[in-house]
């Protein structure tokens, strides 16, 4: 499922207590460009169902699984107080420990 309307149909069949969503930030970036929808409005719609957020950066064209960068659109989601207790999953490929430590500093400093 990639489009907001697909999730709206799903929510008609499942209660919040029966369904948890792992929001993949990289996939969200790709889908929002492919299907022309607002990332932040989409997250607001999913918010009650989000139990985890999978984190990676990409160029909006392909799923690159790059480390997070400063001052990007997704920090508003990551730092949303409603997600303070939601699991954050790092999904970086071919990333050295130095770069991972840098990303952790972003988290400490709220980016």
Placement of each model-derived feature along the sequence:
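Histidine-acidic metal/acid-base catalytic patches
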Residues: 4-111
């Amino acid at each position: 499922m990639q489009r907001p309307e697909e999730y709206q149909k799903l929510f008609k069949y499942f209660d919040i207590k029966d369904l948890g969503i792992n929001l993949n930030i990289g996939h969200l970036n790709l889908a929002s460009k492919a299907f022309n929808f607002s990332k932040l409005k989409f997250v607001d719609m999913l918010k009650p169902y989000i139990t985890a957020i999978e984190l990676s950066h990409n160029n909006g064209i392909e799923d690159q699984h790059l480390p997070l960068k400063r001052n990007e659109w997704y920090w508003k989601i990551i730092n949303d107080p409603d997600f303070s207790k939601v699991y954050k999953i790092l999904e970086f490929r071919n990333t050295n420990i130095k770069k991972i430590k840098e990303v952790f500093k972003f988290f400490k400093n709220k980016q």
